[in-house]
């Protein structure tokens, strides 16, 4: 019995308070104000929770665990799905959730805020971050600087941009001028395939400068924004007004199929096989019924058979 008694005494870390002391505490609480009672209860709760927390930390060791969210600051340590590797880099194929603060910055932030009660804590704004979390502010500014530097390095690494004299983006010159003219040519081909005649009018002054400056192939259209597309449809009823057209260049950048062809005065006869019967007669109606028609055909057959057989009877039709 003595052995068991000694073991039990050793196991209990703190002996329970005597019942008289508890009754005295309760009597004191009755005299105290509500705020003082709440503070006392909090202190007692903290004292009871501290040994439990220490045990958990000792037992966990190298286990994978995730800390809870503390007043808007999420701590995410360990090696889980959305966590970091040992060196602090994100593993390939695993994304870090947006707005997560990890590592030393998170520890500092939680350490600073331990003494402040949740009721009195200010909201997380830019000013409060500068005041209460200077480490976080530094980290975000450093990350932004690194991103800007990476973008600049990526731009400089391109060989075609290094060789250029003017640092104009490549897509600007390609897309900006040609978009309108490509649209015109597409529309022209669309209309040409459907039997409409298309004529393009171009600004000659701009074309001369462009032809001298840029070596363009013959089949390519001009790269100016001033290309005007006109579609001509035959309309004899309309009044024709004399239109003054600008003189064209000797070397045009317009495709051959877009140029207006001269209309031939002689009308071509359509090719086809001439019909041997009147097609209108097929649909004409008659007063004769089908029975009458088939009756006549039967009589004609009967006459033929009698004539072939050499019978004495003669049918008059």
From Swiss-Prot:
It comes from the Eukaryota. InterPro entries: FYTTD1. It is found in: Nucleus, Nucleoplasm; Nucleus speckle. One of its GO terms (molecular function) is mRNA binding. The modification Phosphoserine is found at residues 23, 60, 117. The keyword Acetylation applies. Disulfide bonds: none annotated. A motif (UAP56-binding motif) lies at residues 26-44. GO terms for biological process: mRNA export from nucleus. One of its GO terms (cellular component) is nuclear speck. Keywords: Acetylation, Isopeptide bond, mRNA transport, Nucleus, Phosphoprotein, RNA-binding, Transport, Ubl conjugation. The keyword tRNA-binding does not apply. There is a cross-link at residue 260 (Glycyl lysine isopeptide (Lys-Gly) (interchain with G-Cter in SUMO2)). There is a cross-link at residue 139 (Glycyl lysine isopeptide (Lys-Gly) (interchain with G-Cter in SUMO1)). The modification Phosphothreonine is found at residue 14. Required for mRNA export from the nucleus to the cytoplasm. Acts as an adapter that uses the DDX39B/UAP56-NFX1 pathway to ensure efficient mRNA export and delivering to the nuclear pore. Associates with spliced and unspliced mRNAs simultaneously with ALYREF/THOC4. Belongs to the UIF family. Interacts with DDX39B/UAP56 and NXF1; interaction with DDX39B/UAP56 and NXF1 are mutually exclusive. Interacts with SSRP1; required for its recruitment to mRNAs. Interacts with CHTOP. This is UAP56-interacting factor. The gene is Fyttd1.
